[in-house]
Structure formats: structure tokens, C-alpha cells
């Protein structure tokens, strides 16, 4: 610890916070004090790093997007509400886009997929499409394994897990869009039969669509944390890491959108390619957040194992002393 770090740690407000954090146990931390979790988390991040791993995940996600879209849009025409699905998916994309230019680029990309029929892919190129779409999950699984020293899994087992996770995430997106379609249909009924067009109740109802979007993000993170790591004992679906990652995703997306719209000058400097850079940067930030949530879960699990091992050792020592 250098002189500057010593001055910071010994400062009264910081010392008070450290003292309290050693006594504070947050629900979901399995009885581990906040200070111990934070300390181990930063040591783990310093040892393994985050930036390179986030870049690796980002690359795999970007490369897997076309294949995932081909599969998704090959399934959509078979849904009874395919037109509404398309409109709602574009509306969901608009809600999550940092600015109008980004949305226009994504909208053009999605419309291109919708216009071209790819029904044959469901029978002929299905396995190839799924293979490439699951590369994003494979990248996440490989990146997670760097934090788990005893993670030993065969390639085929990892690939099968990646394919299952890809299916789960695609089903989550489809389910969320279908729920949003139902939400909009119910909103029209409220407007027509109950004349709630300008009421406060309708305002709150319109904003409940954000609850579905938040639920989509949370469940996506939760399923990844539960099934992607190569561990014997799976984490719970609701974990501190998934909650933190969901909060950081929402906060980062909103903050990033505000910055792009008010302070960013990508389009002025790079022209139309600036929009692509915005999308890539947003993917990279969310990859970083995914790793932060994962490392939090790893920290809690590792410290809990240390406590359990220590208790087991003390129990054995007591028996031998008797």
C-alpha cells in the first residue's frame, strides 16, 4: 500500500465506511460481510482483468447477431401475430436504442431480414445457423471459465450448453415481444371501452411495458449466470450478480443514451460509421457489466466455500482432540 492509498484508507469517512462494511451482511451474500466480498472482488478483477474478456465477449456477440437474426426471423412468419411481432420488435429496439441514428441503422438491418424469406433455413441450414448463433454463448462460457480454476468441461458439452442457452434467450425475446403485443392490445381495450385516453391510470399502464423490458434483461442475465459457468453446483436464478448486472445495464444504457444525445459527436467525426461505433461500444459496456455481475457471484461463492472449509477443518480438529 503506497502513501496515497494509506491516506485514503485512514481518512475518517473511509475508515467509518470500512468498519461498517465489515459488519454489514447484504441479503443474498450468504452470510459473507460486504467488505470481504468487495475486497475479494477487486483482487479477482486485478488478477484476471475485465477489459480483454469483455472485448472477447463483444466480438463473439457481434459475430453471432446475423445468425441469431436469421433463425429468429425464420420462425416469426409461422407465428399467428407475425405482423404485430415485427412492429413490436421494432418498438422494443427503439426503446433500447441510444439515439435516433442508432435506431434507424438497426431498423434498416431488421427490415432487411423481414423482407427476405428464409423459410428454407429451418430445414436445410438449421444446424449451421444454430452453430453460429451459439458462438456468443461459447465466448461467454470460455470467458467465465478463466475465473473458475477447477472448470474442466469437454468441448461438445460446452457447445450443447451454449446452444441451449441460445434457445432460451431467443425464447425470452419472443415471449417478451408477445407479452408486449398483449400489453398494447389491452391498452386499446382500456381506451375504447373505459375511455381512459387521458387518465393517470393509463399513463401508468403505458409505462408498465418497461417492467417487461426490465424482466427480459434480468432473466437473460439470470439464465446466463445459472447455466453458462462450468460449476458443479448451479447458482440460484435470482442472484446478487444478476440483480447488480440488471441495475447496471439499465443505468449504463440510460446514461450512455444521454451522453450520446447531448455530448457525443460520433456522427460529426466519423459520419454514418459513428452509429456503428455507438452500437459496438454499447455491446462492449454490457459485456463488461455481464462480467462484473459474474465476478460478484464468484466472489461470494469462493468466500462461502472458504468459510465452509474452515468450519469443517475446525470440526475435524475438535474430534481428533477429543
Regions found by a protein language model. Give the residues of each.
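Membrane-embedded alpha-helices and immediately adjacent juxtamembrane helical segments
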Residues: 2-322
Amino acid at each position: 500500500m503506497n502513501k496515497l492509498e494509506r491516506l485514503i484508507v485512514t481518512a475518517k469517512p473511509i475508515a467509518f465506511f470500512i468498519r461498517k462494511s465489515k459488519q454489514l451482511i447484504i441479503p443474498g451474500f450468504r452470510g459473507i460481510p460486504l467488505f470481504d466480498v468487495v475486497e475479494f472482488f477487486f483482487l479477482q478483477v486485478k488478477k484476471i482483468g475485465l477489459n480483454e474478456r469483455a472485448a472477447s465477449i463483444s466480438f463473439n456477440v457481434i459475430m453471432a447477431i446475423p445468425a441469431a437474426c436469421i433463425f429468429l426471423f425464420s420462425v416469426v412468419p409461422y407465428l399467428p401475430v407475425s405482423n404485430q411481432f415485427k412492429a413490436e420488435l421494432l418498438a422494443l429496439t427503439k426503446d433500447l436504442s441510444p439515439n435516433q441514428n442508432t435506431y434507424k441503422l438497426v431498423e434498416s438491418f431488421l427490415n432487411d431480414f423481414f423482407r427476405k424469406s428464409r423459410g428454407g433455413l429451418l430445414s436445410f441450414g438449421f444446424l449451421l445457423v444454430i452453430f453460429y448463433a451459439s458462438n456468443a454463448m461459447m465466448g461467454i462460457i470460455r470467458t467465465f471459465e478463466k475465473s473458475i480454476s477447477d472448470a474442466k468441461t469437454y468441448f461438445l458439452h460446452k457447445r450443447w450448453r451454449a446452444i441451449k442457452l441460445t434457445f432460451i434467450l431467443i425464447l425470452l425475446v419472443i415471449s417478451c415481444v408477445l407479452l408486449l403485443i398483449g400489453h398494447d392490445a389491452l391498452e386499446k381495450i382500456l381506451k375504447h371501452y373505459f375511455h381512459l385516453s387521458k387518465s393517470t391510470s393509463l399513463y401508468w399502464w403505458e409505462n408498465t411495458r418497461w417492467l417487461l423490458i426490465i424482466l427480459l434483461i434480468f432473466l437473460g442475465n439470470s439464465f446466463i449466470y445459472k447455466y453458462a459457468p462450468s460449476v458443479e453446483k448451479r447458482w440460484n436464478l435470482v442472484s446478487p450478480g444478476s440483480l447488480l448486472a440488471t441495475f447496471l445495464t439499465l443505468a449504463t444504457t440510460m446514461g450512455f443514451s444521454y451522453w450520446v444525445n447531448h455530448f457525443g459527436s460520433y456522427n460529426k467525426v466519423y459520419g454514418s460509421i459513428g452509429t456503428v461505433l455507438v452500437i459496438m461500444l454499447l455491446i462492449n459496456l454490457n459485456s463488461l457489466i455481464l462480467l462484473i455481475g459474474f465476478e460478484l457471484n464468484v466472489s461470494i461463492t469462493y468466500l462461502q466455500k472458504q468459510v465452509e472449509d474452515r468450519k469443517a477443518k475446525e470440526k475435524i480438529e475438535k474430534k481428533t482432540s477429543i
